[in-house]
């Protein structure tokens, strides 16, 4: 029946892994059902979505067991929306699926524009995809899925990189589309509360990929709160856990004292060139920011405000158009890679783009060797909950596991400056506490710690907040108000 999903004894073991990510999973989703799929980091939620979409075993990189049946046209939003970008311009990217479905141009482009408007993306169809922020890429990818008018919508953390206002708008857009079309919806999220009023059913996977809860939202919220919160699930009404700090020896900067890093009247233009010509986008305009040692600073603001660009410029990965970065003795973009890496640890928004090896253990040590710092790899992996994956391939981890690995790899050599782009995306309660604890312990040890984030729980742990809007400094709000 169109829109139905059936898994019988489904299992998946990635190539090179001894244990399966998911084993013996039985699940039936009826046509038109709206299902919230939850569970701790690494439980196999994304694996299930990819299996249902039929894209899990296409590269022959694992063993698939059991049966998976999906009836109807499928729209899949990947956990990392950048993985789905196929065109240089937003319009062509959103239209890609429609072109493959042979939708006539006179019908296709109105659907493309309507989808972009629905996801609140404020750009025309000619805007370059390379100039989009992570949150904007997420909305562009969702627009492509919604424009397809699929019978089954599979959405992997569709709001994880969005500010609260845009996240609410996207949820409303999704539920409106589902209500109008009658499509089946399976959405994966870690932060469950905003979705409970929009779904019929909540399915929770355990750490071994087994179903530990399958019920309606009201029963889920009323009877399972404490048990599932202790298992790592972000339950409604349960406050964020206390950060768990690693031993000081893992995080205290190997070079002290750490510098105060300053952005002074910083402006950045992003230039993108394709066959149509060069497009210049103003990413930052005269931004001032001070990142002090012994403190955690969060860069806040809506999607597309310039947070990632500011981090990249502070870390020497982006050359400023005007203004300067002070504190490292010379402009960071002019420093040699080894000298910069010894001082600055940077975790990008898409962590898998920076992996250098094919084994988790080796990845943690990869940066430390060139800069001459000994690292207790086992202790780093244990704190980040990756010890059982020490011999796994980094590219076959879950999104949350990849993000923690990137953090361990970038920070294990104890740099003086930590620049983290959305470090808590894809984390359950336990792994969130480990990431937040690493940040806080590094700051207590004298490091400069800065993170771009929409996570209000992380903001509540910050000592300072720098807010951006439209590439400029916004009026800063008190930290307590930010946390709300």
Can you say where each PLM-predicted feature lies in the sequence?
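Catalytic Walker B motif of ABC-type/P-loop ATPase nucleotide-binding domains
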Residues: 153-157, 418-422
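Hydrophobic anchor residue at the start of the ABC signature
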Residues: 142, 170, 407-408
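Conserved ABC transporter NBD signature motif
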Residues: 61-74, 323-331, 340
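ABC ATPase C-loop
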Residues: 145-146, 410-411
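Helix-to-loop junction immediately C-terminal to a conserved catalytic motif
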Residues: 53, 315
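Conserved ABC ATPase "signature" region
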Residues: 107-124, 372-389
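Conserved ABC ATPase signature
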Residues: 128-132, 136, 393-397, 401
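Conserved beta-strand-loop-alpha-helix hinge in the C-terminal portion
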Residues: 208-233, 472-484
């Amino acid at each position: 029946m169109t829109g139905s999903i059936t898994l019988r004894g489904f299992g998946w073991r990635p190539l090179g892994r001894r244990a399966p990510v998911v084993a013996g999973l039985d699940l039936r989703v009826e046509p038109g059902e709206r299902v919230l799929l939850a569970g701790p980091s690494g439980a196999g939620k994304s694996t299930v979505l990819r299996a249902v979409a039929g894209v899990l075993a296409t590269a022959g990189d694992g063993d698939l067991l059991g049966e998976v049946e999906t009836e109807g046209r499928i729209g899949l939003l990947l956990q990392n929306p950048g993985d789905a970008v196929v065109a240089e311009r937003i319009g062509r990217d959103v239209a890609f699926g429609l072109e493959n479905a042979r939708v006539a141009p006179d019908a296709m482009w109105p659907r493309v524009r309507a989808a972009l408007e629905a996801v609140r993306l404020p750009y025309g169809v000619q805007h370059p995809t390379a100039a989009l922020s992570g949150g904007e890429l997420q909305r562009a990818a969702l627009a492509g899925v919604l424009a397809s008018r699929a019978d089954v919508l599979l959405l992997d953390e569709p709001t994880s990189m969005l500010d609260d206002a845009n996240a609410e708008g996207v949820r409303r857009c999704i539920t409106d589309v589902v209500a109008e079309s009658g499509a089946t919806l399976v959405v994966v999220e870690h932060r469950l509360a905003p979705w409970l009023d929009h779904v019929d059913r909540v399915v929770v996977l355990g750490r071994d990929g087994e179903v530990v809860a399958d019920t309606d939202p009201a029963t889920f919220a009323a009877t399972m709160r404490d048990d599932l919160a202790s298992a790592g699930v972000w339950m409604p009404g349960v406050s964020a856990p206390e950060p768990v700090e690693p031993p000081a020896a893992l995080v205290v900067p190997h070079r002290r004292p750490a510098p105060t890093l300053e952005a002074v009247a910083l402006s950045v233009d992003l230039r993108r060139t394709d066959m149509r010509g060069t497009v210049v986008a103003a990413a930052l305009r005269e931004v001032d920011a001070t990142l002090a040692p012994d403190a955690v600073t969060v860069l806040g603001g809506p999607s597309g405000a310039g947070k990632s660009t500011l981090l990249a410029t502070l870390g020497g990965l982006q050359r400023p158009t005007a203004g300067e970065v002070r504190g490292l003795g010379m402009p960071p973009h002019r420093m040699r890679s080894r000298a910069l890496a010894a001082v600055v640890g940077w975790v990008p928004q898409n962590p898998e783009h920076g992996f250098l090896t094919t084994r988790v253990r080796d990845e943690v040590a990869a940066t430390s060797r060139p800069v001459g710092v000994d690292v207790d790899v086992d202790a780093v992996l244990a704190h980040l909950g990756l010890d059982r994956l020490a011999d796994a391939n980094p590219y076959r981890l879950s999104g949350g596991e990849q993000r923690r690995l990137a953090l361990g790899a970038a920070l294990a050599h104890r740099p003086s400056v930590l620049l983290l782009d959305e470090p808590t995306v894809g984390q359950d309660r336990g792994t969130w506490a480990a990431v937040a604890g690493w940040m806080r312990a590094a700051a207590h040890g004298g490091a400069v710690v800065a993170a771009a984030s929409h996570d209000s729980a992380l903001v509540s742990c910050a000592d300072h907040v720098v807010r951006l809007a439209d590439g400029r400094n916004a009026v800063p709000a008190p930290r307590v108000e930010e946390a709300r």
